[in-house]
């Protein structure tokens, strides 16, 4: 089967936004106008196509990225293939956003015209910045009371530190929002009728003429800056043609020099088609973005894979989902080469072979079997046994490991136990399945109490995990109180000289290590060897590192993992017969236990960045309450008629905050919270924690 659409006609993009900015509604409209949906699904009544998990429909928030393929005919009459990844907007699911951004070529950032740039928008924007994803901005909900397009544009600069390139101006606002002024064609587009299938083109309203000319001038000035020849021509008074202008805007967007801004209201079906045209005009195809880099497994050198069907096959697994009909589905982005059903693949991260069973093209919750897929495609593979999120699948003859994704450490833990004996075995299976799907969710056993502990990114994250166990796996479980994931570190330098000797008949054990333990600024563990003259033979040094790493998971104060430790092996001794890697491992373990105590161990707690948006009447109460939670207020600012309170608060003091904020503000204030950094625990609190965990 030959390729149906040229790779240049592909657009792999996602829609990213704060919770409630209208993302699901926007995706629904896109699917409706591109012909995939026969009826528009409204989030308000829980009938949306993309939000296909039952819980998402209940909560009205999008949890898992659903991938959808659809088609759009651009202004030039050529059909384009859109692969849309829907991303969640709630802060507990930033991991999902990170995963989808990793495999996208472009994105649309949705803003609520009333609220402008909200906290979660900033978080997602920063993640997109990390992967240099070209972005456009769509100011949505222009029909909402308090909608302010110009303030939203200003916030793109002040809050996100990004250059906004305004392509449209709104005609009217709130209930009077009629349409937009297209600043490239310099014409007005107005939508009528309930489903806004087509816009009428007309003159720019006289009251907007001057403003449109001013913004058109700004647009041209910013666009010509991306190209030297265009800048020179412009300075000599030669204006770019509309075609040249579109090409310049495309170049600037793809190179992430600026971000085109459009506006409308997805709910009222105004402004969606021009946005789809803009996706075609300005967002990159797979060949417009830099080739993905990775490591050549054979040479261990860096390599790149071009977006071409002729290159060796390479794809990245970015999501695993359980489908009630097909079983486990692995979503993959094909970066290079082509893939046929039934072929053998290599998982280079796990060093395992995988046999490809069914291959599916997904449309939100329906699916179609396909025989072959090409570079640029996003597909769901059934029947993979070993592959987890972030793994590379490729041609076994040309093995490569594509860049790994980084996943944050969970900050909150709860104990969980099955309600009945029958649930016991099912719970283990369910938790392992869910952990394979979501790298920010961890399961472990507490060795002393024998309890099962689950850890995640926030209370909502773990609520949803427990809920999914009940719904999808029919497992009823009792859940304990949330616990904080504390850490331990050291505060000063300690030098330990430790000798491990065991002489009890037969082969003995001998190893001497002299190690300097010291704190360092990062969170990771650094090991260095300064052995000269063979005091510790080279083959035993990995044993020293392994020994220390094996006990880093349990600190001396309360058994929490250690952070920010540097260990330097400076001297040692060995015995020709009795020394072994194991002996050095044991010696290093004991040296670390001594060293951690002598190096002034301290407890660390996760500090959360909290942002509360509240009506002015409750600001005093909100600040007083955050202070009582050991919070440090970093500032307040006005946002429209509301006030934003920013604070750093220990996670230990934030449990149940949603209920107290609700009662304090009569349900009118909202908050978002995300992990920021670890900080030493005050000594009085540390003693309590040590007693509790001792």
UniProtKB/Swiss-Prot annotation:
Signal peptide: none annotated. GO terms for biological process: ribosome disassembly. Its main location: cytoplasm. This is Elongation factor G. CDD domains: EF-G, EFG_III, EFG_mtEFG1_IV, EFG_mtEFG_C, EFG_mtEFG_II. InterPro entries: EFG_II, EFG_III, EFG_III/V, EFG_IV, EFG_V, EFG_V-like, EFTu-like_2, G_TR_CS. GTP binds at residues 17-24, 86-90, 140-143. Keywords: Cytoplasm, Elongation factor, GTP-binding, Nucleotide-binding, Protein biosynthesis. The keyword GTP-binding applies. Pfam families: EFG_C, EFG_III, EFG_IV, GTP_EFTU, GTP_EFTU_D2. PANTHER family: RIBOSOME-RELEASING FACTOR 2, MITOCHONDRIAL, TRANSLATION ELONGATION FACTOR G-RELATED. One of its GO terms (cellular component) is cytoplasm. GO terms for molecular function: GTP binding; GTPase activity; guanosine tetraphosphate binding; translation elongation factor activity. It is found in: Cytoplasm. Residues 8-287 form the tr-type G domain. It comes from Bartonella henselae (strain ATCC 49882 / DSM 28221 / CCUG 30454 / Houston 1). Disulfide bonds: none annotated. The keyword Nucleotide-binding applies. Belongs to the TRAFAC class translation factor GTPase superfamily. Classic translation factor GTPase family. EF-G/EF-2 subfamily. Catalyzes the GTP-dependent ribosomal translocation step during translation elongation. During this step, the ribosome changes from the pre-translocational (PRE) to the post-translocational (POST) state as the newly formed A-site-bound peptidyl-tRNA and P-site-bound deacylated tRNA move to the P and E sites, respectively. Catalyzes the coordinated movement of the two tRNA molecules, the mRNA and conformational changes in the ribosome.
